[in-house]
A protein has these predicted regions:
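Catalytic cores and adjacent flexible loops of soluble metabolic enzymes
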Residues: 1-232
């Protein structure tokens, strides 16, 4: 029997209402007012939580010469990776301000750290939930640091093999972590319908014995509707 997990008075697990997290991430582009506006939009839409990213660029980028090409507002943009991440990096006081805004709107504030220092920052904020990035599922020291906090943790599994998910779950539990949620995720943007693979949700639940969520990168609402048949 899977034990429900309590997140700020909201239950996640069998029989509980769907817990909806709105992904803000770094989509505020470093604009604090835009981040506040996105919190309000998420609250007005009925979300339970919003998620940000907290990081220091120097913790995961070692050079400033790498460039990144992406699509923004329908246009292809190429720029320095360092400059892009620095522009979107939120200072501690801004994160604290956003957390207070979430509390006023009855939203769970949570965030994705990229280092142990980022985990400690969220602990100081009194975070009620932590989450990794799929690209950090194989960063076992970070997962152990998250587990050691005792805070409920979401591990996203995009791009991972089953063996890598096994390793991450064992690392979390061996480090004392108890309240674990896994996210079924396909790291394609957008995800083609043929790659959504909702049948992986009951398979993960049976293997790991914990609540399984869905990180959806597909277009439209079809996958969100179809998930009902995958969890019932």
């Amino acid at each position: 029997m899977i034990k429900p997990i309590d997140i700020s008075g909201r239950s996640i697990g069998p029989g509980a209402p769907c817990f909806i997290a709105a992904e803000i991430g770094i989509n505020h582009n470093g604009d604090i007012q835009l981040a506040h506006n996105m919190i309000d939009v998420a609250a007005d839409a009925g979300a339970d939580a919003v998620k940000f990213q907290n990081y220091r660029t120097e913790d995961f980028l070692s050079g400033r010469e790498l460039t990144y090409t992406y699509i923004s507002q329908g246009h292809e943009v190429t720029e320095s990776q360092w400059d892009m991440f620095k522009r979107c990096e939120l200072p501690t006081e801004a994160l604290a301000e956003l957390r207070r805004h979430c509390e006023r709107r009855n939203l769970v504030f949570f965030s994705t750290p990229t280092s142990e220092a980022g985990v400690e920052q969220l602990v100081r904020f009194g975070a009620h939930l932590l989450k990794n990035g799929s690209d950090y599922l194989v960063h076992l020291p970070l997962i152990r640091a998250m587990a050691a906090t005792g805070i409920p943790t979401v591990l996203s599994t995009g791009m991972a093999t089953l063996e890598e998910i096994d390793d991450a779950v064992h690392a979390f539990r061996d480090a004392g972590g108890r309240d674990l949620i896994l996210l079924h995720c396909t790291s394609s943007y957008p995800t083609p319908p043929i790659e959504v693979n909702l049948r992986n949700i009951p398979a993960l639940r049976e293997r790991f014995g914990c609540p399984i969520g869905f990180s959806d990168h597909s277009d439209g609402i079809t996958a969100a509707i179809g998930i009902r048949n995958s969890i019932s």
